[in-house]
Every structure is written in structure tokens, then in C-alpha cells.
Curated annotation (Swiss-Prot):
Localization (cell): Golgi apparatus membrane
Homology family: Belongs to the GOSR1 family.
A biological process from GO: protein transport
Coiled-coil boundaries: 8-67
Purpose of the protein: Involved in transport from the ER to the Golgi apparatus as well as in intra-Golgi transport. It belongs to a super-family of proteins called t-SNAREs or soluble NSF (N-ethylmaleimide-sensitive factor) attachment protein receptor.
Transmembrane region(s): 202-222
Topological domain ranges for the Cytoplasmic compartment: 1-201
Gene that encodes the chain: GOS11
Protein name according to UniProt: Golgi SNAP receptor complex member 1-1
Record has Transmembrane as a keyword: yes
Keywords: Coiled coil, ER-Golgi transport, Golgi apparatus, Membrane, Protein transport, Transmembrane, Transmembrane helix, Transport
Pfam family membership, one: V-SNARE_C
Amino acid sequence: MDVPSSWDALRKQARKIEAQLDEQMHSYRRLVSTKALSKSDGNESDLEAGIDLLLRQLQQVNAQMQAWVSSGGSEMVSHTLTRHQEILQDLTQEFYRHRSSLRAKQEHASLLEDFREFDRTRLDLEDGYGSEQALIKEHMGINRNTAQMDGVISQAQATLGTLVFQRSTFGGINSKLSNVASRLPTVNTILAAIKRKKSMDTIILSLVAAVCTFLIFIYWITK
């Protein structure tokens, strides 16, 4: 920035910077008032840097005006300097106030975003835990079904073994029955012969008894 050589040039320079500051402060006020709760971006940073630069330039011009007044300026010049100094002070205070408000909003937004991120992480962990629990339950269900299937297979194998044993037992019985059946004709023949022999013995005994009785009767009559 060129250094003005006269009071009028300093005043013009001060008013020019003040006008630029008014314009940028208007934009900054609107930004702060309408800024949604979000983290910092490049818009306010660029605007703040421009305002801060203009404030430093206005401060330098005021310092030059102060040096001019100190070198023997009139009371009117001193009053003009005071007015420019008040404008600089008001703009500086307003800028710092709005910037503090914006920083508070940004910090609040950052905290909210951190909490949201924490909630998302927690939900992701809970979802992961829920999925893990579901897999564990599914695995346990498969194990239970496998155990039940093993039990059914064991029972089936035991039943099959019993049936095989019974089949072999019945096979032995059938074999014995077949043996007996094959020998029955011989047994029947023997039994029939025994019965016939008993019948003959009975007949003979009966005849002997009858003869003896007849002889005794004859003997008794002739006596």
C-alpha cells in the first residue's frame, strides 16, 4: 500500500478501506447469521482473511493520520482522526464478536458430528455383534440338528442290528423246524409201530385173561 503524502490522501485512503470493510462485514454478518451448524469450510476462512487484512491496513492509515496530527494538525483534523479511530475500533470489535460466534457454532457442529460418528460406530458395532450372535445361534442350531440326526442314525443302526439278530434267530428256528419236519415221518412210523405193539399186547393179554377165566370157570363147575 502506497503511503499518502497529505492529510486528504490519508482520509481518502481511510474511507476507501472503511467502505471495503463495510461491504465485507455485511457479507460476514450474513454468513454468520445464516450459517448452518457445520464444520469450517473455505468460505468464511477467505472472508475472515480479507477482513483481517483490511483492518490492518486501516490501522496503518490511522497510525499515519495520528502522526500527521501529532506534527501540528488542527482541532478539526484531530476530531476527524478520532472518528476514524472509533470506526476502526467498532469494526474490529464487531468482527471479533461475529468470529467468536461463528467459532462457537463450528465447535458445536463439530461436537454434534463427533456424537453422530460415535452413534454410527456404536450402531455398526451393535449390528456386527447382532450378526455375530445370529451366526452363533445358527451354528448352535446346526449343531443341535446334527446331534439329533446322529441320535436318529444311532437308533436306526440299533434297530437294524436287532432286526438282523431276530432274523438270524428266526432262521435258526426255521432250520430246526425244517429238521424236525423232515424227521417226522420216521417218528410217526415208530410211534405207530409202538401203538400197534401195545394194541397186540392188549389183545393177547385180554385173550390170556379170558382163557384163564374160562378155565377157572370150567374147573369150578367140574369140582
